[in-house]
Design a protein with these regions (language model features):
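Conserved PLP-binding catalytic core of the aspartate aminotransferase-like
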Residues: 206, 210, 218-251, 258, ...
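PLP-dependent enzyme catalytic core of the Aspartate aminotransferase-like
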Residues: 247-285
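Substrate-binding/gating loop at the entrance of the active-site cleft, primarily
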Residues: 17-20, 38-55, 63-70
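Structural signature of PLP-dependent enzymes
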Residues: 171-213
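Active-site PLP attachment segment
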Residues: 128-165
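Conserved beta-loop-alpha segment that forms the PLP phosphate-binding cup at the N-terminus of a helix
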Residues: 1-3, 8-34, 43-46
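Active-site phosphate-binding strand-loop segment of PLP-dependent enzymes
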Residues: 65-117
Length: 285
């Protein structure tokens, strides 16, 4: 079910308890002393997973045109693995996947690792045609699968780098107790996506996301770079801290403080009515 939905090879596709455990299982098989490129202000569990290992860590600052920063650093020629969130949890920035495909052509030995927790379930994805060599994600976010489950996929290039068969990773992942009910929840969520036409659901989500991006920009509540980038996720950081957060919570709008702003997001089940309600509340003094 997972391999079919995500366009991955069944033998290279794994159910995991969550992203943090899965990513650590996978990178524990990597050769030591590899040069890893990470982003500053990246999802902490992704960063710590590599910092806990015997790797050489290199970081570049987070910036609106992050692709330029990545390209400049890779040009030095010493990076073995680029690891990043496909969608940034703290800003909603969506990495340009076409840019990553171009990187793979120019740096054929580069391994690209993606945290897909804020991506899978929110965008159509085919792993085998993507530039990624490892993608891991928890199921509780956009996959709507509840807690205790996740998915991980690896490429043939990743298998070549670890010089082990996929069974070695399988044995790591399934070592010890596994929550069968949580796995069933993940399967249920994926089957529900398929039943209701996932591509159609994503089209609905994309439409409301585009409307929200434009309207929130019109009232000056999101940074200008969000509109300037070719593609953005459905996660937005609204300007304003405690006051905005309290106002939204009071009006039954789910949100969370994030940095110097407030994070909101839209999924396929949100409607224009939801967006209009949000805008009405935000425009009130």
């Amino acid at each position: 079910v997972l391999a079919k939905f995500f366009g991955s090879t069944p033998a290279n596709t794994f159910v995991i308890p969550n992203f943090s455990i899965g990513i650590r299982n996978a990178i524990s098989l990597l050769p030591k002393k590899l040069n890893i490129l990470l982003l500053q202000e990246e999802y902490p569990s992704l960063v710590k997973a590599f910092e806990e290992g015997d790797f050489n860590i290199h970081k570049i600052p987070m910036q609106p045109e992050i692709e330029e920063g990545i390209e400049k650093r890779l040009a030095k020629g010493d990076i073995d693995i680029l690891a990043l969130s496909i969608v940034q949890y703290a800003s909603g920035l969506f990495i340009d996947i076409e840019f990553l495909k171009d990187l793979k052509e120019r740096y054929p030995n580069l391994i690209i690792v993606g945290d897909g927790t804020q991506f899978l379930g929110a965008h159509h994805f085919n792993f085998d045609t993507s530039p990624f060599d490892l993608v891991a994600a928890s199921g509780y976010k956009w996959l709507l699968a509840g807690f205790g489950n996740g998915v991980m996929m690896i490429s043939e290039a990743y298998i070549d780098m670890i010089q082990k068969k996929p069974l070695a990773l399988f044995n790591l992942v399934f070592n010890g107790h596994f929550n069968i009910l949580a796995i069933a929840s993940l399967r249920f969520a994926i089957k529900a996506f398929e039943k209701h036409d996932f591509k159609l659901l994503m089209k609905k989500k994309d439409n409301i996301t585009q409307n929200a991006k434009q309207l929130l920009n019109d009232i000056g509540l999101i940074d200008s770079w969000v509109l300037q980038r070719g593609q953005h996720s459905s996660i937005f950081i609204l300007k304003g801290e405690k006051g905005v957060h309290k106002k939204l919570i009071k009006n039954n709008i789910k949100c969370v403080p994030r940095g110097k702003g407030v994070r909101i997001s839209f999924h396929y089940y949100n409607t224009d009515k939801d967006l209009n309600h949000l805008l009405e509340i935000l425009k009130k003094d």
